[in-house]
């Protein structure tokens, strides 16, 4: 099976590494950083340096592929123009070149649950209205729409709305390293949704095996409040306690509890259904 992974950062590289162990897969990996070519050649048969605005390079990537995994993220900036260039422009250019690549039967995109916006801690599922809290969230909604519109009888499009990503090399203590011993605004009762790297890799594998299409949330079973999560981390690793200042309220743009029932109903079994403290 010929598979291309567009965007080999933390997630894309892990998917490539997993598939590289399976002789059934011929992997094409892309990077925007030429210096990473030799590293990626250890987990892919072919490496192409390509940016999302380079239609010629994308056309070379998708030719003769059976499946595409789109796993991209801005390198350094959270500015809206960086998000637009990384996500929306890449999606539009990819859809354009896929029209000339009939061999591609499936496109899998690793998106974000941030498209739901602030639901004040309410539960949401894949049918819930999308109310992104900022311009970056709106760009992610538009990116989903562009990709979903490309689906047809020949091409299945599967979108994973990922929780916050953690795992080997991206441990929770590293993610929150600046929080310990500090005072954070609010009460800490806002909810966050997480997903382990192992489950992202396994879910992508699952999606290819079952030829999934449509939208699926990919998050752990039970969302945790920020206070609970940081308290648990502080206790386990003997780190300074995080304090909260209710007088300094801060709007949390992604305060929702995200359901993972749909992917479970499809037959996926989580490796880490609970957050690994």
List PLM regions with ranges.
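NAD(P)H-binding glycine-rich loop region in Rossmannoid oxidoreductase-like domains
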Residues: 32-37, 41, 45-97
């Amino acid at each position: 099976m010929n598979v291309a992974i567009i965007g080999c950062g933390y997630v894309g590289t892990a998917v490539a590494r997993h598939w590289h162990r399976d002789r059934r897969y011929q992997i094409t990996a892309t990077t925007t950083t030429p210096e990473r070519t030799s590293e990626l050649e250890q987990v892919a048969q072919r490496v192409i340096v390509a940016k999302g605005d380079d239609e010629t390079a994308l056309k070379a990537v998708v030719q003769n592929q059976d499946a595409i995994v789109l796993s991209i993220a801005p390198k350094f900036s959270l500015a809206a123009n960086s998000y637009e260039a990384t996500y929306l422009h890449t999606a539009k250019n990819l859809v354009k070149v896929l029209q000339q690549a009939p061999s591609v039967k499936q496109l899998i995109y690793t998106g974000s649950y941030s498209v739901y916006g602030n639901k004040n801690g309410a539960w949401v599922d894949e049918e819930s209205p999308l109310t992104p809290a900022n311009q970056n969230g709106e760009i992610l909604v538009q990116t989903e729409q562009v990709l979903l519109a490309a689906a047809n009888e020949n091409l299945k499009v599967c979108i994973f709305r990922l929780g916050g990503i953690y795992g080997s090399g991206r441990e929770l203590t590293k993610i929150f390293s600046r929080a310990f011993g500090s005072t954070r605004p609010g009460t800490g009762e806002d909810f966050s949704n997480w997903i382990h790297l192992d489950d992202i890799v396994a879910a992508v594998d699952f999606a290819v095996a079952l030829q999934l299409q449509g939208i699926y949330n990919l998050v752990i079973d039970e969302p945790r409040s920020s206070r609970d999560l940081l308290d648990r981390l502080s206790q386990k690793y003997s780190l300074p306690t995080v304090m909260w200042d209710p007088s300094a309220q801060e709007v949390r743009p992604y305060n929702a509890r995200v359901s993972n029932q749909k992917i479970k109903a499809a037959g996926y079994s989580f490796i880490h259904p609970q957050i690994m403290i």
